Amino acid sequence: MLLWFCAGALASAQVTAPPAAPPPAPQTLTLKDALERAQMNAPQFLAAISDTNAAREDLLQARAARRPSLTGKSEYLGTQGNGVFPSGRFVTNDGVHVYRDWAVVHQDFMAAVLKTGYRRAGEGEAIAKAKLEISRRGLAATVTKAYYALLTGQRKYATAQQALDQAKQSLDISQRLERGGEVPHSDVVKSDLQYAAQEQAFRESKLAMDTARLDLAVLLFRDFDQSFGVVDDLNLAPALPAFAEIQTMAEHENPDLQAANAALRAARLDVQIARQASLPSLTADLAYGIEANAFAWHSTVAADPSKGKVPNLGYFLTVSLNLPVWDWGTRSSKVRQAALKREQANVELSATQRTIMRNLQGLYQEAQTAREQVDSLRRSVDLASESLRLNGLRYQAGEATILELVDAQTTLTQVRNAYDDGQVRYRLAVANLQTLTGAF
């Protein structure tokens, strides 16, 4: 009875156990999704964002430096007495107890008038923004390459699977025809060799697809998730604008050119800043508060207590005019140093302009050639498919040799892979071109 009860309880527990949750379905990513994920994980891109934010803070600090600053100060000065004078042993103080509690307004008039430091910080922010855009476009090209490497890997894997099935079908046909005495045994051997070659090609295509998935997962997922798919949009490639339009976009939207121009402007401002070091500097400090022998609104002065209590609250103003006279040529050296950097920035701007024009023409021609190649390969795929179909029928009818059939199978596989590579080549050419022009 006890055994029956225990068995029943065990069966009840097994029945009421909750079912295991099904594994989550793998997510499917578009190229846009991949780009957004990569921007959240790429260290160099995040570093460029950090540099841009830091440059923005530099600009805020330079703007604040042109305005008056307000600080508060509270001190107690205790001086050892000498037993004779109420001022104590230090002549700088007028009593053994001194209390200071005031607010100080400071203004640098040269920074407010010249504005050179503020403008220099603005150019620094412009450089950082341009470098951020360079990083963004470079990351987009990298992700696009990895994305379509996986996509073409999947296509080639499917092509290899289809070629393997065709090789198996050809082997079966050869064996059947051999049994009927219609073809020699050499046809079966050739078909078997072709089938073995396609098996190896299938394994290689799977390895290439898995490797491409790993490469893309590194860019997209912090947890290195490999359970994802990609949307096949190779047939939706953007059209290629006219070269004149591309050239105009590059002139206005190229971040390398923007960074080089901003660097030249910054170098010119550095020369001005170096020269302005020879100008007089004018500052003012206005203090308002108390500096007395007692922490109070009114108190007696330790040096002359007979006068009674006097007001402690008041102000004093310090205006300073500093004239640089002699520094052993340091300021002149800094001017020459800044001028050398300005000339180098000018040289780099010229080199950047030439490089952009060279890359623009080269990448545009690459995109044009790739687009024409895609059109040609699309027709080749249709012809190769028809050739395989006809050679298969001719071989079964005894009108074609096994070599012709194997050659048709190999040609179709090669043309399909070439077509996939051609489509990816065009997409990558467009992505590289967009690093110069921006999206179009």
Each language-model region and where it sits:
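Bacterial N-terminal signal peptides
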Residues: M1-A9
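Bacterial Sec-pathway N-terminal export signals of envelope proteins
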Residues: A13-E75, G81, Q107-F109, F224, ...
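Small/polar, glycine/serine/threonine/aspartate-rich low-complexity segments that form flexible
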Residues: T16-P26, K73-Q107, V231-F243, Q272, ...
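Amphipathic alpha-helical coiled-coil scaffold segments and their short linker/junction regions
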Residues: L35-Q39, D187, D192, R222-S299, ...
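A glycine-/polar-enriched beta->alpha junction
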Residues: E36-L46, N53-S69, W102-R120, A130-R137, ...
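Short segments within alpha-helical structural elements
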Residues: A64, A197-F224, R379-A439
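Periplasmic alpha-helical coiled-coil/stalk elements that build and connect Gram-negative outer-membrane
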Residues: G138-H252, E366, A370, L412, ...
